[in-house]
Amino acid sequence: MTVRVGINGFGRIGRNFYRALLAQQEQGTADIEVVAVNDITDNSTLAHLLKFDSILGRLPYDVSLEGEDTIVVGPAKIKALEVREGPAALPWGDLGVDVVVESTGLFTNAAKAKGHLDAGAKKVIISAPATDEDITVVLGVNDDKYDGSQNIISNASCTTNCLAPLTKVLDDEFGIVRGLMTTIHAYTQDQNLQDGPHKDLRRARAAALNIVPTSTGAAKAIGLVMPNLKGKLDGYALRVPIPTGSVTDLTAELKKPASVEDINAAFKAAAEGRLKGILKYYDAPIVSSDIVTDPHSSIFDSGLTKVIDNQAKVVSWYDNEWGYSNRLVDLVALVGKSL
């Protein structure tokens, strides 16, 4: 069955999700159709930003407008909505939408996201950490907990999707007592281009000119997908002046002693086995630009593994836009199987 999708919010993640879907469709791995997008931006701007992208380049499809409310991408026609009144006002039922990808960043609590269900959708996937959701899913880590009964689903954050495979391998193989992480993260639209007012006074500073320390909920969110680690991890982010391509540094106290070789072997086995497609193993001395447009959630850098006694440091890269958007596509496919 083809899963019919509506996208609410056609910004960075909404457009990346659609591009990732096109890429997977070309490979024959996604039976998903986007039937509508909703955004308060005018349709000509949406079409232009889909066609031209500063990171991903030009979309290899013709993109045009048909009438006032249809975006044409190659052979596909997408209904373009401009509903401002909130999720409950969207015509998902009339359009036969099965799953909504909620990517505005505005409706991340269950009470607001439920409006999509009231409007006729069967499931909602929030492309961000959420509150009061039915389940948070990180593919490869706890997707077995999704049983079809949950209607409001969070795909967690890009950083949690990178961190969770690290913690899973370490905890499964050696046991984690506690840990601290840092994500060195590309800047995002939540930061200022130039110094200006912001509720976070560090994010108030010019994103392209500074290393900006700020918060991340990624470590604490691990407890949602690995309950045995609840309260055992914490950390923060350092936003850096690049547009995409981030890296997570995790230092953990292990229950069992392990060498660098033991840890690297465990990650290589996981990348080639149970976490294939989610976790990637690298021995090459890579830098951030090398992993841009890599679809994996977590790209393990074996050359950076360090161990002192029972304390281990592991590092994994991730394209915080493209990798995450590919997991959104995969999660839509997973949810679609339960419809």
From Swiss-Prot:
Its EC number is 1.2.1.12. It comes from the Bacteria. One of its GO terms (cellular component) is cytoplasm. GO terms for molecular function: glyceraldehyde-3-phosphate dehydrogenase (NAD+) (phosphorylating) activity; NAD binding; NADP binding. GO terms for biological process: glucose metabolic process; glycolytic process. Pathway: Carbohydrate degradation; glycolysis; pyruvate from D-glyceraldehyde 3-phosphate: step 1/5. NAD(+) binds at R12, I13, D39, R84, S127, N320. Keywords: Cytoplasm, Glycolysis, NAD, Nucleotide-binding, Oxidoreductase. The record marks H185 as: Activates thiol group during catalysis. The active site is at C158. It is found in: Cytoplasm. Pfam families: Gp_dh_C, Gp_dh_N. D-glyceraldehyde 3-phosphate binds at S157, C158, T159, T188, R203, T216, G217, R239. It catalyses: D-glyceraldehyde 3-phosphate + phosphate + NAD(+) = (2R)-3-phospho-glyceroyl phosphate + NADH + H(+). The keyword Glycoprotein does not apply. The keyword Nucleotide-binding applies. Belongs to the glyceraldehyde-3-phosphate dehydrogenase family. Homotetramer. Catalyzes the oxidative phosphorylation of glyceraldehyde 3-phosphate (G3P) to 1,3-bisphosphoglycerate (BPG) using the cofactor NAD. The first reaction step involves the formation of a hemiacetal intermediate between G3P and a cysteine residue, and this hemiacetal intermediate is then oxidized to a thioester, with concomitant reduction of NAD to NADH. The reduced NADH is then exchanged with the second NAD, and the thioester is attacked by a nucleophilic inorganic phosphate to produce BPG. This is Glyceraldehyde-3-phosphate dehydrogenase.
